[in-house]
Amino acid sequence: MFTKAQIDSEKLNPNSTFFKEALASTHEASTLLHLLDNLGKLPAGFNGKVFIPLLSHPNVKIRRLAVKNVGKLKDECFLEKLSTFAGNETDTLTRREAISAIGRMRSEKAIPILTQVLSDADPKVVSQGLRALLCFKGNPEAEEALATLRDHPNEMIREHFENAKTANAKSVVEQSHSKSLDALKNVIVCADVQKMFTLIPDESVHLTFTSPPYYNARDYTIFESYKAYLDFLTAVFKETHRITKEGRFFVLNASPVIVPRISRAHSSKRYAIPYDMHPRLTDMGWEFIDDIVWIKPEYAAKNRNGGFYQHRKPLCYKANSVTESVMVYRKKSDKLIDWNLRQYDDETVETSKVLDEYEKSNAWKINPATDKGHPAVFPTELASRVIQFYSFKGDLIFDPFAGSGTVGRVAMDHERYFLLCEKEPEYVEHMEQTWGTSLLYPSKFKVLSLTDFKCNLTGRW
C-alpha cells in the first residue's frame, strides 16, 4: 500500500508515470480503492487521463471514485466521456457523481447534457441535474430547462425546484432564529385566532402544539359542514406555517370524532380528522415527520361495543377507541436540523437536553386529564414530552386553541415562553384565575384583548 505522504509527493511531479502504473486496472481492487480515496485535492495540470480506464472497471466503488477524481479537475476535455459514462452507468450513486462532475466544470457546453438529465426516470439523478443547472443562473437555456420541473410528476423534484427558486427570495426576518419578540412572550389573547394572526409577524414562533376544537361533536351549529370545518383548520394552520420559524415543528393532537345521530332514523357518523387534514398540511408546506400514538387506559374510552357484546352479530362490531394521533410536522426547509441546532449557543443546547428516561417508541401510554373549567384538556405529561422534544429553553411555544392553557403552563415549567389564543372568555378567565393564584406563575403572563395585543406589539397604547 502507498502511504499518504508518497501519494501527495507524486501528485506534485507532472512528469511522473507513477499514477499511470499505480492505477492500472489490473491491480487488486483494494489497492485501487486506497489510492483513489487518498488522492485528495489534485493540482492544476494533473493528468486526469489515468482515471478514464477505471470508468469501465467491474467494481462500482472504483468507478465512482474514478469519476469523482475526474470531477476534481473541472476540465472540459472530459465532458463527452463523462456524459457517455453517465448515460451508460447503472448505479444511481455513481451516475449522480458523474453528473456532479459535469456540473463542477461550470461550462455552458454542459447545459444541453444536464438538460437531458432532467428527463431521466430516476428522481435522484434528476435532482442532481437540477443542482448542476442551478449554477447557470441567468442563462436562458438553463432557466428554460429548469422551468420544466415546476410540473414534474415526482413531488420531491417539484419541492427541490421550489426550494431552489425561493431560497434567495425569502423575506428578511428582523429577529434571529433563536429569538422571539418580547411582546409575544407569555401572552394569552382572548380573540378569534384568525384575527390575531393578522398582527403576528412572519417567523415568530418556534413550536406549535395544539388540539383543534372537535367538529360539531357537542353542538351542531358550530360549523356549517365538515368541509367548512376542514377549511377553517386549513386557514389556521396555513397562518401557523407563516409565523413558524424556518425548519421548526408543528405538532397536532387530533383523533377521529363521532357526531351523534340527528334522529333514530339516522346513524352516528365518524370523521377521520387527522387523516383528512394530513394532505392539506403537506400541501401548504408542512413536512410529515412522525405519527405518535397516544394510548389511553381502556377505562377512559367511550363504550361503543355494548350492543355487539350482547348479540355478537357480524357487521356490528365497533372498537372502543383508546388512542389519539399526535402528528409531527416540520416547516419545509432546504436546511437540515443541524442548521437549526447551530442557531443556539452551546449553553442553551446543553441545558435543553432531555436527560431523563424517555419513550423510545411512537406509542405513548399517558393517562388523560380532566379539568372542571374545560371539557377537553391536554394531559400535562403529553405537553411536557412534546415541548421538551421539539423546542429549546427560551423558545416561544404557540397554541392557537388554548382551551385550559396546558401548553402555556407546561411551557413555563420547562423555561420556555408561550403565546396562547382562546376565543372563549370563560376559558381565558379560568386560566387567569387558576394561574394567578398559583405560587409558580404569579405575574408571569398577560391576558390581552385583540386591541391590547396590537398595542402591546406596536408599543402604542
Show where each model-derived region lies.
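Amphipathic alpha-helical scaffolding segments comprising HEAT/armadillo-like alpha-solenoid repeats
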Residues: 9-24, 43-56, 75-88, 107-119, ...
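Alpha-helix N-cap/helix-start positions at coil->helix boundaries
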Residues: 28-30, 45, 60-61, 76, ...
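Core catalytic lobe of class I
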Residues: 97, 122-124, 128, 182, ...
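Alpha-solenoid HEAT/ARM repeat scaffold
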Residues: 17, 29-33, 37, 49, ...
